[in-house]
Amino acid sequence: LFGDTRRRVPRWYDLDRPVLQGALFGPESYALGAAAQKPYFNQQVSESLRECYRLFAQHTGREYGPVSTHMLDDASLVLVAQGAAQETARGVADYLRRERKTPIGVLGINNLRPFPAAEVVDRLKGKQAVAVLERLDAPLASDSPLLREIRTSLDRALESGSPVLEYPHLEQRELPVCQSVHYGVGGQPLRARDLIALSARLADGAGPTLYL
């Protein structure tokens, strides 16, 4: 900063291209903006995200979407996972089907917000039991974030669906049992043998939150 030469200082403000940053809102203006955010921004994100998935597939040849499935059509037990845990869960599902004839599949959640509620309900309806895998701990919370979204979606679909939110119709007999599963706490890896043991327990019904 001192001497014969100085580093160039970034031009924070360009008078030829003025931009308003960090504007202050009065209470009334802020309330109106918050109310307008949902119809003019939030409700458009899902469609924009689908278009991004389409363009990504067009450029790379790899198909992605809000959810992904693996051997789910005839499965009665489902492992719900996000991120890299999907690969481990798919490997376990392949092993259990091949070696133990267990009717198990995997549902991958690729975006938590906006939550793909209709797709999740459509793929979980009629299943016997669902293990929701989450890499976190949720002290003092009744449900962890992903499990809460799934249960809320199933409950809304159980209320005869919603034409506005496009929830599919769900009968009480089609409602799966959900099991909360936390893994990776303290940096522990997600092991295939743990998922195999979890799948055997899942067939007996849900219980308190399990830690892998």
Where are these regions (language model features)?
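Core nucleotide-handling region used for phosphoryl-transfer chemistry
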Residues: 101-129
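Redox- and metal-dependent alpha/beta enzyme cores, enriched for Fe-S-associated oxidoreductases
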Residues: 66, 70-100, 115-120
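A general structural motif
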Residues: 45-64, 81-89, 109-116
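Peripheral docking tails and interdomain loops at the edges
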Residues: 131-212
